[in-house]
Amino acid sequence: MACVIPAYRAAHTLRAVLEQLRGSLPCAHLIVVDDGSPDDTAALAASLADRCIRLAGNRGKGAALRAGFDEALRSDHDVVLTIDADGQHDPSYAPALIDALEGFDIVIGARLRSGSPMPLRRRMTNAMASMAIARVTGVRLHDTQSGYRAIRRRVLERVRAQGDRYEFETDFLIRAAHAGFRVRNAVVPTVYGTASHFQGMRDSARIVKTIWAHRARSEREVS
């Protein structure tokens, strides 16, 4: 299996994430995609990960995930785990997330708050997105926006999501659900302490736009 870790300005947290992943998933192929970080993120990734991809400029989380997925598909990995590089996700829960794939194609880590609470704007975006995605896809999930995910290879081979920032993960989920892939949540703890690269209203607007585009497309197909 492979782990795809999108990273931006993660020099202070990346080492711990990668070392903990090595302990939790010793056989996993670790792929770090550095999204044009100006700090030592790329140097750390090159020394600690199995593969380091460096994007030209800060293109966004979606662009980093897309590059990581393409890299993972070049080998025979049957499962790909995505985890953020900022330390919000506990790598020790990775095996449980993968085990939860039994009978499913995608498992999304549903965030339990521990330590600092989830920022209010992110909480509101997550709640509204989950409700809207349920209306568009018929799939009801507690948390649709978490970046801690386990994904079967067959999903990545079929689903080509759009967007370069956080809307990529929403678009990916909707396209996968429409393609008939089975999705579920699994509870994972999340710590909010470091600053997020989520750009408030701008990224929230991109997510809403993505959901409404899919809803409009579905309505046209029905009519």
Label every PLM stretch briefly.
Residues 1-2, 29, 171:
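Cell-envelope/extracellular polymer assembly enzymes that use nucleotide-activated donors
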Residues 2-6, 54:
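Short hydrophobic beta-strand elements that form part
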Residues 9-23:
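Short, well-formed alpha-helical segments that are part of the catalytic scaffolds
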Residues 12-16, 39-47, 92:
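Acidic helix N-cap motif at the loop->helix transition within catalytic regions
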Residues 34-42, 87:
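A conserved acidic beta->alpha catalytic loop
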Residues 55-74, 88-166, 192-202, 207-210, ...:
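Acceptor/aglycone-binding surface of glycosyltransferases and processive sugar-polymer synthases
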Residues 77-86:
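Short beta-strand-to-loop acidic/aromatic patch adjacent to the donor-nucleotide binding site
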Residues 140, 164, 174-191:
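Catalytic donor-sugar/metal-binding loop of nucleotide-sugar-dependent glycosyltransferases
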